[in-house]
Amino acid sequence: MNDTIAAIATPLGKGAISVIKISGNSALNILKQLTQKQDFTPRYAYVCDIFSNGVLLDKALVIYFKAPYSFTGEDVCEIQCHGNPLLAQNILQACLNLGARLAKAGEFSKKAFLNHKMDLSEIEASVQLILCEDESVLNALARQLKGELKIFIEEARGNLLKLLASSEVLIDYSEEDIPSDFLDEVSLNLEKQIASFKDLLDFSNTQKQKNKGHALSIVGKPNAGKSSLLNAMLLEERALVSDIKGTTRDTIEEVIELQGHKVRLIDTAGIRESADKIERLGIEKSLKSLENCDIILGVFDLSKPLEKEDFNLIDTLNRAKKPCIVVLNKNDLAPKLELEILKSHLKIPYSLLETNTLNSKACLKDLSQKISAFFPKLDTQNKLLLTSLAQKTALENAIFELQNAKNHLETLELFSYHLLSAIESLNLLTRPYETSQMLDSMFSEFCLGK
């Protein structure tokens, strides 16, 4: 904890600036030697020359944060140099030569945690904000970083501590009967607390599934336009398009964002009877992808009459029993597909879309509207979020213990035992872990300079 550490806080690569962070008792002294300047007012920005052994390295913006008013709670210095990775490495090496050591992954955040600048829920939120790929969850993470999850947990903890104190008082006067109004009040209190915890847990589990991305399989007979549809949605030539049947022999997967939701597009091999062994394997993978997907795009060629392969596809869609968008492709050509017959054979709820892939942007817009209609409408503006398995496990244990406490209301010793166990589980959400090994494991997932 007393070491002075340094690291490059920005991604390696060329850009406008790179940031080098220094934290520890020697941070200010190192900055003075780097800049050959002695006076720094905390929280003021200075433009300074940066030297190493008397050799000029760069002109940079530097800021000194005096302990405890910094991210880590220690003296912190930031050097914002020009964004050349070689230059940033040279300045970092100069810091190391002056007595700093290279920071471990997540060590700045670990210092902030150990110095009580952030709790576990805020630490979790900070790393998830960096990793998050879902725009709709950013607000919930920002609110968690602000400390709203901590406030929620601490309020619940305070409520349970009051119940525990009341129970302990009654235990001390065990010769008297437990007041019935006390039991009713405590039971109602616990029910509300359990419900609020379950709401948080259910929302977090739903969000976790959503973060994996909605799997969308594109299926159809050969040459129906599946690969063209994929390319249109990606606005690039990702899949090979050919008039030769069986061109796509394996599944192709790409990730896009539609209206703040991550979508995994899976282009599949054309479904038909084939004597080609490799193509048959591709078709088997196509059918397998339908079992694991969330939404199906069933592609039909509007310019051709329905044939056996189309009816096989309809049977496949009916068996899959998944949300389905029936895409009638190639509507720029004269329509020959018997639409009413197609509709009569579909036995599942579906949405219908006529389009063509020649106009990629229009096609993408039409599909986005249809696909997004299947997305769950989640209110993340007013929701808190659990971001790790450890947090979810702790809350699940708290719920379990509260339910046990409620079941043992008339046996105060057991009630108090389960209530205390629930409080201890809540502590794991915001309060320090007990072993340094667990801390090291948690912060090792962070990046350098964080």
Curated annotation (Swiss-Prot):
Binding annotation for (6S)-5-formyl-5,6,7,8-tetrahydrofolate: K21, E78, K117, K450
Secreted among keywords: no
Entry GO MF terms: GTP binding; GTPase activity; metal ion binding
EC number(s) from the headed UniProt entry: 3.6.-.-
Localization in the cell: Cytoplasm
The protein's required cofactors: K(+)
A Pfam family matched in the record: TrmE_N
Binding-site list for Mg(2+): S227, T248
Sites where the protein binds GTP: 223-228, 242-248, 267-270
BP term (GO), one: tRNA methylation
Location, primary (coarse class): cytoplasm
InterPro entries in the cross-refs: G_TrmE, GTP-bd, GTP-bd_TrmE_N, GTPase_MnmE, MnmE_dom2, MnmE_helical, P-loop_NTPase, Small_GTP-bd
Cofactor detail note: Binds 1 potassium ion per subunit.
Family to which the UniProt record says this protein belongs: Belongs to the TRAFAC class TrmE-Era-EngA-EngB-Septin-like GTPase superfamily. TrmE GTPase family.
Description of how the protein assembles with itself and partners: Homodimer. Heterotetramer of two MnmE and two MnmG subunits.
Role: Exhibits a very high intrinsic GTPase hydrolysis rate. Involved in the addition of a carboxymethylaminomethyl (cmnm) group at the wobble position (U34) of certain tRNAs, forming tRNA-cmnm(5)s(2)U34.
UniProt xrefs under HAMAP family: GTPase_MnmE (MF_00379)
Protein name listed in UniProt: tRNA modification GTPase MnmE
Organism, scientific name: Helicobacter pylori (strain Shi470)
